[in-house]
């Protein structure tokens, strides 16, 4: 049933947390499926568990070269304020923020300007999937501040490249956030 419904193929990366499976399918037998986990252990899963329950299959992500990034940073709420024209001009005149000079700036606060900048930064990045959802948004404030979430997809699906890309973009974001007086 797994093969007939194309639920699983050898080589698929699957996750089944309750059984400790997180790796590549090695073998699909009549009664068991063997998964080589990323820590080089083998998990043997009864096929009925996969047919009757839920598991995560990462095949679609790999086939379509699109892996989601969904992370947030917290902004100190006390630093969020309305922007006067002079402050707005001073912010966008900084060399690191050149991306803001070409667009229309219909924002009232420094956090909105920061969101506009990061959105434009992602729109101009070659490794961001432009045909998929790309969003910079504010989440519900917490005791830790105002979470600004970055939701996007990258064409880098291989684990090490994916993690390096996240390091690159979040290092950039964290280095420019103070330029917005946040």
Report residues per predicted region.
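Membrane-bilayer interface helices and TM-boundary transition segments
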Residues: 1-36, 41-44, 51
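Structured, soluble regulatory/oligomerization domains located on the cytosolic or IMS-facing side
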Residues: 35-182
């Amino acid at each position: 049933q797994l093969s007939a419904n194309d639920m699983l193929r050898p080589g698929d990366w699957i996750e089944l947390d309750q059984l400790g499976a997180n790796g590549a399918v090695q073998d699909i037998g009549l009664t068991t499926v063997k998964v080589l986990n990323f820590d080089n252990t083998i998990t043997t899963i009864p096929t009925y568990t996969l047919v009757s329950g839920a598991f995560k299959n990462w095949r679609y992500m790999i086939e379509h070269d699109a892996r989601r990034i969904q992370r947030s940073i917290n902004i100190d709420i006390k630093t969020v304020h309305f922007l006067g024209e002079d402050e707005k001009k001073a912010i966008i005149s900084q060399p690191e923020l050149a991306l803001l000079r070409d667009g229309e700036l219909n924002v009232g606060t420094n956090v909105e300007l920061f969101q506009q900048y990061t959105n434009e930064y992602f729109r101009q990045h070659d490794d961001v999937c432009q045909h998929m959802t790309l969003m910079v948004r504010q989440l519900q404030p917490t005791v830790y501040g105002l979470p600004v979430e970055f939701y996007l997809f990258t064409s880098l699906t291989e684990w090490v490249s994916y993690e390096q890309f996240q390091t690159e973009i979040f290092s950039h974001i964290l280095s420019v956030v103070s330029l917005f007086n946040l």
